[in-house]
Amino acid sequence: MNERFRNILLDRDGTVIKERHYLADPNGVQLLPGAGRALRALLDAGHRLFLVTNQSGIGRGYFTLAQFAAVQQRLLQLLRQFRVEFTDTAMCPHAPQEGCQCRKPRIGLWEQLRLTHDLVPEQSIMIGDKIADIRFARRAGLAGSTLVLTGHGVNAARELGWSVADDGRSPTPPPHASDRPDQPDIVAADLAAAARWILTQPEQPPRDGL
């Protein structure tokens, strides 16, 4: 296992499960293809998994904390068939206008996990489908960040200057991407591709795109 990525922080909607607008119904939870097996492979290799999710639908009044909990239980139920469990989940329930410190890209959720589990940023990587996930990783000083092209990922990659086909294939970075602070370390088709990249990295992985 590459020690730089011992702790894997994962966005939920659009990364692990199918993106649905303000998901409040447990029946709407659907694992993205390959996600369960990818998480199992990471656990088998010794990584720890943490879910880090913004849920502003609570603060906006679109659904309740109890409904969020029901959705979470359904997710855990679906992952159980792959023998996957998260070490912990950190969730921000606030609407953007509340100005909290826990809504990504602010790093309150990282601080919560860091203090609870003695995490160090040099051994942690963030995987998500939004620019906020990449900025979160940068601000927390994490060892790496991965943008997946599921969920909002294609639009996020294009906003960052990447050339991406509508089907998410063949992402091409913008010129001098490695010098730009908001760029992910890699862009991957999905969580399964991101996991494969992590699992094959040497101790000092190069900055790359796939």
What are these regions (language model features)?
Residues 35, 39-72, 85-98:
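Substrate-recognition element of Asp-dependent hydrolases with the DxDx(T/V) motif
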Residues 15, 56, 131:
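Short glycine-rich anion-binding loops that position phosphate/pyrophosphate groups of nucleotides
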Residues 24, 57-61, 134:
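Short, solvent-exposed loop/turn segments at secondary-structure junctions
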Residues 2-4, 66-87, 96-126, 130-210:
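Asp-based, Mg2+/Mn2+-dependent phosphohydrolase catalytic module
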Residues 15, 53, 150:
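Ser/Thr-centric signal marking residues that sit
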Residues 10-12, 53, 127-129:
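Active-site flanking residues adjacent to catalytic metal/cofactor-binding acidic residues
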Residues 19, 61, 197:
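Residues that scaffold the ATP/ADP-binding catalytic core of kinase and kinase-like folds
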Residues 1-50:
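Active-site neighborhood of HAD-like aspartate-dependent phosphohydrolases
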